[in-house]
Amino acid sequence: MMSSSYWSETSSSSCGTQQPTEVLQCQPQHYHYYHQPSQAQQPPEKNVVYERVRTYSGPMNKVVQALDPLGSREVLSPLKPASSYQSLVWSDHSQELYSPTLKISTCAPSTLHITQNAEQELHSPTVKVTTYPQTTIRRYIVQNPEQEPLSPFLRGSQFFPGNNVIYEKTIRKVEKLNTDQECCPQIQCHHHVIQQPQIIHSPHCQQSHSSHQIQCITENDSNIGHELCHGGPSQIHEQVIIQDDGPEKLDPKYFGELLADLSRKNTDLYHCLLEHLERIGGSKQDFESTDTSEDIESLIPKGLSEFTKQQIRYILQMRGMSDKSLRLVLSTFSNIREELGHLQNDLTSLENDKIRLEKDLAFKENQMKEYEELLASVRANNRQQQQGLQDSSAKCQSLEENNLSLRHTLSDLEYRLKELEYCKRNLEQENKNLRIQVSETCTGPTLQAKMDEIGNHYMEMVKNLRLDKDREISKLRSQLNQYQKDVSKREGSCSDFQFKLHELTSLLEEKDSLIKRQSEELSKLRQEIYSSHNQPSCGGRTTITTKKYRTQYPILGLLYDDYEYIPPGSDTQTIVIEKTEDKWTCP
């Protein structure tokens, strides 16, 4: 079991990138690793020592690499198990320590200097780094219990508390020059248990356009060092002292570029807000002329460099732009709130009108149903009255025919009566003639008696004939009177029928006019229903059914680029609904 403290980690791909010099600070933490026994262990190769390369990365992705000692008690061979909670990741590719951010120089055992110079190379009096295919073991330790690691090899494992620290250990094969000497004091400044680690990049010599910077790693050692040789009884207690040459200076050029970029973005934000305010109908004069009186140059202290003045100028400009943007945002929200209030009022009015129109439509539909029922009943009554009128007209026609027949029979009877009267006169004249003739020829009582007998018989015959004719005439007269009475009665009934027909025709005309009006209203309603589902027709009369609403909503300018805002100086337009009158005929 061993304890170590690490800061953070970067992968081996980041070792070849040169990072800017910054101060690396971290908090010391102690974690324990347990060896996991391997299934098959093979003896290490001869004349080969396994050297571990540690890679650390700080808060700003600053990379520091260090070599573990040859006499470390940790894993000495890639064939032995690594003290980690993860499986070993093996890669068989050529790997050599050529990093521009880390080179190890020979130094005293108490101090380890790491120079950031790509021109230097690794020189050791006893160790020679050879370029041949190596076997690399990397182990990862993620120390953040609140966040699951991004690496697929670390998911599901136990994490240590910390601030997302990943430690990568690389083991390389290093060929020995002297096989008799396995260790040397010159390379004994290696792995220790760190109690209060602090990595400081201290610039020893800063020149203009110079890329050589020295990084010092200082550590406080609280554990006992490892043995120099396998059988050597002596032990070395090493301490790495912190070398702090003062705070590192920031790059003013980088800071100025950052301020310029922030100023540009702030200006772009202000112009974007101003454009949106113009699109919703706001005024921009109040915002552009408020801060013009402020003199930025008077606020800049004297005696500073031009670069510092420019940075302060950027900061003051950003402050002014931020103030303007704040006022623009507040004005925009006030305009939006006002427009939303107008929209809410118009929406409420439209909903009320919609409810009213729906009620009117329901009422008209009920009226339409009632009118249809009334129309059906009127049609039924009209059919019945027409049938009765046809029957009465047929009866009148039959009565007229009977009257004509009676008139013809009466004329025939009158003609026969005239014939009988004519025959009577002829007989009387003949009787006179016979009397005269008899009186001239026969004068005696027998003739007189015979003449009286013939006269009496003739008188009886005439009397009987007259009685028969009188009875027949009286009978015919009674029949004629009866016919006349019947005709008069029938004529009175016909006049009653005609009066009733006149009343019915007037009632029918009124019903027809009512039906016509109702059919017009029905056609209007049907046209409204049809126009509500389809586009309104072109013809017809136009009626205003809604109230006056606002037709301009500047808030819509935020949604549509082609929206044209009209100032509220003009009168509000009126929304109308076109209705088309179509005549609807009854089936």
Swiss-Prot record:
Task: From the UniProt record, give one GO term of the biological process aspect.
Answer: actin filament organization
User: Which cellular component appears as one GO term in the record?
Assistant: bicellular tight junction
Q: Where in the cell is it found?
A: Cell junction, Tight junction
One GO MF term, please? actin filament binding
Where do the coiled-coil regions begin and end? 331-529
* This protein's UniProt keywords: Actin-binding, Cell junction, Coiled coil, Tight junction
Keyword Coiled coil among UniProt keywords: yes
By its UniProt entry, which InterPro entries does this protein fall under?
Answer: POF1B, POF1B_HlH
- Pfam families, alphabetized: POF1B_HlH
Q: In which tissues is it expressed?
A: Expression absent in adult ovary.
- Biological role stated in the UniProt entry: Plays a key role in the organization of epithelial monolayers by regulating the actin cytoskeleton. May be involved in ovary development.
Subunit structure comment from the entry: Interacts with nonmuscle actin.
Name the PANTHER family on file. Answer: PREMATURE OVARIAN FAILURE, 1B, PROTEIN POF1B
| Descriptive protein name | Protein POF1B
State the organism's lineage. Answer: Eukaryota, Metazoa, Chordata, Craniata, Vertebrata
Gene name?
Answer: Pof1b
